[in-house]
Amino acid sequence: MGKILGIDLGTTNSCMAVMEGGEAVVIPNAEGARTTPSVVGFSKKGEKLVGQVAKRQAISNPENTVYSIKRHMGEPNYKVTLQGKHNTPQEISAMILQKLKADAEAYLGEEIKQAVITVPAYFNDAQRQATKDAGTIAGLEVLRIINEPTAASLAYGLDKGEVEQTILVYDLGGGTFDVSILEIGGGVFEVKATSGDTHLGGDDFDQRIVNYLLAEFKKTEGIDLSKDRAVLQRLTDAAEKAKIELSGVASTNINLPFLTVGPDGEPKHLDIDLTRAQFQKMTEDLLEKTLVSMRQALSDAKLTPNDIDKVILIGGATRMPAVVELVENFTGKKPYKNINPDEAVAIGAAIQAGVLGGEVKDILLLDVTPLTLGIETLGGIATPLIPRNTTIPTRKSQIFSTAADNQPSVEIHVLQGERGIASENKTLGRFTLDGIPPAPRGVPQIEVTFDIDANGILHVSAKDLGTGREQSISIQKPGGLTDAEIERMIKDAELHAEEDRKRKEEVETRNNAETLINAAEKTLKEAGDVATEDQKSKVNAAIDDLKKALEGKDAEEIKAKTEALQEAIYPISTAMYQKAAQQAQQAAGGAAGRTDAKGPEETVVDAIMR
């Protein structure tokens, strides 16, 4: 079996590693560097450039250079135009992967066909699928997609030999942020919770400096540079350099001569001092966002900062002193610094590749799904099948039914999110199961199965248990959650929890009432002489009362009338059951030991159908 490449496909930089002699080794690229800028461009002569060479020519050729494409993975309508050709994020990412693959092959002297690629823990299904597709386009069989914080913990835990540790992994990369809580012990790496923001990273810190420089230049020179792409590229490069320098010094000078020309043709230069204190002040809200995610992850894991044994920082942006201070103050632990934050994820990916290839033994990786998955049911309710932070791979099935008599099909509306109301969540996909035989509502049994594979990619199927007819969908729909959508899902779930609970309870109360009315009317038709006229009259009156209550909006009134109908129908149902039992015994001829009693019925939830 050939080498399996471990790849950290980053927003700003990418890194690769393989297992050699039982150890994960970082592979340098063709230029000799251990990381490769995630930049793609085309020279003015039409030559494709990837990595450092693409980054170097960006200032003079910004319109044909692409940065931070990872931020757009999974977006359906996002295209990048290079040399007149429209490219998807998958295609741009594939160009980066192709360079990594070629450089690894040159270094190892053998062909690379397979890879393990990492993604942010908070990447949704569409973003994960897009990453896998990029690998396929690059000529790689992607054996596994794993979360970056989990990969970093593998890099940390492989040679430590310690057991039963709770680890917080804080991953602030170029364009994404994740925090994960893991328990490590006995070779098992189990993710307990994860939280984050797929649109927060070092790029955002750079942009704050760029905005500051633009404002200062406009204030002193009266010139707006925000529309000049070449100037913006120079400012972005200078901002990144200043950010890095401020990790080691208290103040830095940003000097960009001949930045532009004034109305009189005179050259204009930029010369500004920036202190670490100024930089931290202009970015404190970004750091606060990461603090919110840390609190969320600990809450989901049902832990406190005191329960954390070790803290790992990964991603180049964690070199900023303010980040280190924030994490240390929150957890009360000094971050573990014996891992290169730029290389830890690739090393972990290589270790996972070693597990898959049989080179690494006695390691079990248990990752989680970041958001709740479910379907829409009658009344617009979001019915969860797989809660967030469930260990993957996982499979869950639940029985649903029809919402109307003689319903020929059901639509399965697949959702992702934390709200109790379907319309407040993210739609992942829809599909229809046809060919359901005519039957009263609630009778057909439709088994809906959610299956999340080890890559975190969801597959959904629906099966009519009566006919065996089945329909399925792999959720590979392009498009994904924005950072605002992800943050809104968690925050809205907390802010509107009581409102959702009441709305859900009201819908369920109505559903139960309508179901009981149908059952009661059916029972009356089948009762025959088992029920007295007085009993039938009471049931009909109770049905009328409940129908009238359903015309209003008083949930308590509906509940009361539902209970009244249950009490009215109970004597008839009991008498019918006893009669059926007597007939069954007579049909059995009194044979000893023989029974025809039914087993317990399965709970059926009505599925919404459009």
Curated annotation (Swiss-Prot):
GO MF, one annotated term: unfolded protein binding
Zinc is among the record's keywords: no
Cited InterPro entries: ATPase_NBD, Chaperone_DnaK, Heat_shock_70_CS, HSP70_C_sf, HSP70_peptide-bd_sf, Hsp_70_fam
SUPFAM superfamilies, A to Z: Actin-like ATPase domain, Heat shock protein 70kD (HSP70), C-terminal subdomain, Heat shock protein 70kD (HSP70), peptide-binding domain
Keyword line: ATP-binding, Chaperone, Nucleotide-binding
Pfam families per the UniProt record, alphabetical: HSP70
Domain of life: Archaea
Keyword Ubl conjugation applies: no
Family indicated by similarity: Belongs to the heat shock protein 70 family.
Entry function: Acts as a chaperone.
HAMAP family: DnaK
UniProt name for this protein: Chaperone protein DnaK
Gene field: dnaK
